Amino acid sequence: GGCTKDRVTIEIKGTVTMAEQLWKGRFSKAVDSRVNDFNSSIRFDQRMIAQDMRGSGVHAAMLAKQGIISEKDCEDILSGLASIADDLASGALEIDPNAEDVHTFVEQTLTARIGDAGKRLHTGRSRNDQVALDIRLTLRDYSHTLQAYIVELIKVICRKAAENTTAVMPGYTHLQRAQPITFGHALMAYASMLLRDLQRFEDATARMDAQCP
């Protein structure tokens, strides 16, 4: 099918021991475990592994399209990423909480599986670019999920409001009882609030799409 795959979808289940840090060669002896713990971000960035692998798949396809890596390397990278995704989803592979970060985990696991082609994946991409992309993709995915929940909640509220058009209750202003309203009318006030929240998420997501690296 060529090197065009741009999405890898996985579910995270737990944790692969990464014994080697990328910067280990700078030191003449083992780094204190407290330093490793301070530097490690795997505890919170492992939730971005699906987005990290998705971004890596697209980056590999771009490198192949520009002739920077071969089609064979790209296909190996995509196949390797897919195998990692499958093994994580099935529980055959776990992410070690002692791994430094999710990016190193993916890169080293991929290289162990497909060889030198895995090392070429990082060509033309800084780690900061990768982190920025992962964060934006993750936030965008979370935003879409929250939007779907809000839409469903608004639907439920509207349905309940329609069922309570004759249920009279007091309206309030400045915490004081005011004119009579229906319970359905009161519910629709919350639907309007949630609709504004939905619009804010939509605006934020549009910014993520426009500014995504």
Regions found by a protein language model. Give the residues of each.
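Short, Lys/Arg-enriched N-terminal segments with co-localized hydrophobic residues
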Residues: 1-17
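A helix-coil-helix interface module used to build multimeric assemblies
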Residues: 18-213
